Amino acid sequence: MAVDALGADVTALDGLADVGGVLLTASHQFPLGMPLHSDRRAAVIDWARRTGSVIIEDDYDGEFRYDRSPVGALHGVDPDHVVYMGTASKSLAPGLRLGWLVLPNRLVEPVVRQKGETEETSGFVEQLAMAEFIVSGSYDRHIRSMRAEYRRRREQLVAAVARSSPKTTVAGMPAGLHVMLEIAGDESALARRLAWRRLGVEGLDLYRHPDIGHERDGVVIGYAAPSTSAWSAALDALIRLLP
């Protein structure tokens, strides 16, 4: 599906035959950074109900919204047609391999069976520790602390770009652990210059579908990885190289 300022163009689903499901990141699209518009949320729910299809909702960055409360999940609107999917890979660490599914009742047994056939274990100790982390309230406190830190970093990045690179535009809403910068100039050349300075930045070309034209130049920048002590230097190095 094409993606525009309103998110994924779910109206395209009506023109496709034999589609049993669709994967959406309704809370925060990567890498462009917008949520799925309310009209399109309603449209995709209507499509799933009419066709008996399933929406797989990846709650991407749902816990990291900085300007307002997180957008409600599609699953809350229609739990019979939406599989809600989340993970602790960003809030804690990807190496924990902890994630969760909230399934329609009819899918619980086949999904559990299929998971057992393809994966022997999911780390029982890690699951028990995560359960205790959640029940004790520690996970919620951790999320609040991380949200405040990442909000601060994003605000510093946005302010620095506005101050030093007026031809560069910060795209997307205040959420997640990355920003997409629309730049004046060649994204590949900028990505190479940033890589030379050991800054892990990717051009939009990495994410474009081969059938989609080159509409704009941009780079995707994650701001969560640098340590607290390294953040200021990393930000300064980035800003010096922006066109």
Identify the function of each model-found stretch:
Residues 10-18, 35-50, 54, 61-91:
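Active-site pre-lysine segment of PLP-dependent enzymes
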Residues 102, 180-182, 222-224:
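Short hydrophobic/aromatic beta-strand micro-patches
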Residues 76-110, 122-125:
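Active-site PLP attachment segment
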Residues 195-220:
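Conserved PLP cofactor-binding pocket of PLP-dependent enzymes
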Residues 106-108, 128-145, 162-165:
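Amphipathic alpha-helix from the class-I
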